[in-house]
Amino acid sequence: MPVQPSPVVMGIETSCDETGVALVRDGVLLGDALSTSMDQHARYGGVVPEIAARAHVQALVPCVRAALASAGLTAADIGAVAVTAGPGLATALHVGVSAAKAYATALDVPFYGVHHLAGHLAADLVDGEPLPDPLIALIVSGGHTSLLRVGDLARDPIVHLGDTLDDAAGECFDKVARVLGLPYPGGPAVDREAVGNDPAALAFPRPLTGRTDSPYTFSFSGLKTAVARWVEAHPDSTVPAGDVIASFQEAVVDVLTAKAIRACRDHEIGDLLIVGGVAANSRLRALAAQRCEAAGLRLRIPARKRCTDNGVMIAALGDLLVRSGAAPSRPDLAAMPGAFLDQAQLGVVQPTQRAA
């Protein structure tokens, strides 16, 4: 008998300021749509939760319709619904979770609440091969900076090797960009302004890289302060602004890549995955590639369009869970703004264990 295809999984992402919807089946992206409220937040220099939530309410149904249209499907073709249940902005998450439950109930299909960061880990699945098992993952975004040991993403616990003690890398980019007079969002602005400038012009500190420091723990608050103090102390400096920006960026990516490479070596794991919004940074991608090649490691980074928040990564993770035989999430699952990353799925009815 012919093998029956897996169901079409609709993924919904509303954790911050992007409204993303995508449709995936058997690891293949069928269609997607994305809407952002970034421009509405720019005047405030950061994301305003109430504005983000209202934008999700306005954009979600049109995104569902657009994703279905791009796939040539109808709502009746959807066989499961996956949604980011956390972490993120509470009101923004609530919009997505409520909509996902409504679609799942109306269509009488399974509902899967998933962890936003696990979605980032799955972002490349529709464009590449299955993820190696095990691997070391570096998640770098506006709200999170973590080094993880990842096995089977659908079944195994996710092990934290180290996290940031204060600011996340993306948060540091945004705050320093503001100090340097760059527009919001700061990460892409820093990346653009650093191109062609001297990353060795200024020796900004590399936090927690000393012999006695925790090898996998991050801290970027001190670096942020060091840049701000340098700018304040040198109002008439002859150092070009582009060199200041490039030197700051180099300090961040130097720390990120050095700690990630060390984690791979210490745990004797030959694969490194870098994901999250900061993974779109051109210097991080280049330095990671250079250092992985020198260390004999295999590097995997999603395409830039998959690094920032999107519905594709949530649909891809939902599809992986469905194909792995994971039980649906509890129907009473609520948004979990502070969800800790130790499993890909949230609100599991019966946790799926790896076969012995």
Swiss-Prot record:
It comes from Frankia alni (strain DSM 45986 / CECT 9034 / ACN14a). InterPro entries: ATPase_NBD (IPR043129), Gcp-like_dom (IPR000905), KAE1/TsaD (IPR017861), Peptidase_M22_CS (IPR017860), TsaD (IPR022450). Binds 1 Fe(2+) ion per subunit. It catalyses: L-threonylcarbamoyladenylate + adenosine(37) in tRNA = N(6)-L-threonylcarbamoyladenosine(37) in tRNA + AMP + H(+). It is found in: Cytoplasm. Pfam families: TsaD. This is tRNA N6-adenosine threonylcarbamoyltransferase. CDD domains: ASKHA_NBD_TsaD_bac.
